[in-house]
Swiss-Prot record:
GO MF annotation, one: Hsp90 protein binding
UniProt protein name: Inactive peptidyl-prolyl cis-trans isomerase FKBP6
Function: Has an essential role in spermatogenesis. It is required to repress transposable elements and prevent their mobilization, which is essential for the germline integrity. Acts via the piRNA metabolic process, which mediates the repression of transposable elements during meiosis by forming complexes composed of piRNAs and Piwi proteins and govern the methylation and subsequent repression of transposons. Acts as a co-chaperone via its interaction with HSP90 and is required for the piRNA amplification process, the secondary piRNA biogenesis.
Gene behind this protein: FKBP6
Gene3D superfamilies in alphabetical order: 3.10.50.40, Tetratricopeptide repeat domain
Amino acid sequence: MGGSALNQGVLEGDDAPGQSLYERLSQRMLDISGDRGVLKDVIREGAGDLVAPDASVLVKYSGYLEHMDRPFDSNYFRKTPRLMKLGEDITLWGMELGLLSMRRGELARFLFKPNYAYGTLGCPPLIPPNTTVLFEIELLDFLDCAESDKFCALSAEQQDQFPLQKVLKVAATEREFGNYLFRQNRFYDAKVRYKRALLLLRRRSAPPEEQHLVEAAKLPVLLNLSFTYLKLDRPTIALCYGEQALIIDQKNAKALFRCGQACLLLTEYQKARDFLVRAQKEQPFNHDINNELKKLASCYRDYVDKEKEMWHRMFAPCGDGSTAGES
């Protein structure tokens, strides 16, 4: 998103004497505030639901002053944008309103009048007083965590009053939140979200004909927990969650792989080999599984060599020619 593209391409053919760049641009934009304080032009359509009022959003944005090629504010150069909660983390009222009009994957251009941006005073020296600003915003994703927070605060009895689909939806949101935190390397926080999802699914009583839906939702959460505990250097707990996943699907290659990784860290080499060979049987050409088997072989060779050296030292003759145990 560059200012050069904005200034050169957006307004071609729309020149009008005496009108500024933003005035000409505003003529083709949609009024979403009701007073033309926030105007919108969709560059790329999104899909799915609109952003919920209490959602946490993952966005990329760049803010421009009129006739400036470079943004005065942008997070486009960050590898991973920060998750921001509506009503708390977003300081521009215009951006808040704009996001509420967007769907996942949407890219849009907005004009914010001063009362929806930096006010009559601006933000010296960067933003002059009474300045209209342009923002290009891409909505990567959003999580309606407020709904799940409220649901998780209910008692088990209250949660049972809701249909199963509601529980599955909330659990999926918790898992998505955990996945985001995991990608940020915030493993402890991710673990908390995964555990919340698992608790919801475990305490949900479902009729036999719907139990398979609960088990299907549990499986990826258990796999996430196993991987997260490996990242937290807690292989015993990682193994526990991996084995729980295998109860649901005994041939699941990812669960077998996680169990093998955990056993290798615990130096339980035979168990590690058993799990990894079973995983390889399910996915013979999986690069990660095959590499882990090579790593296991190397670790086991080192272990055997160290054992031999230890026993050799224990039974080696003493320096004066006497053997261990001689008086």
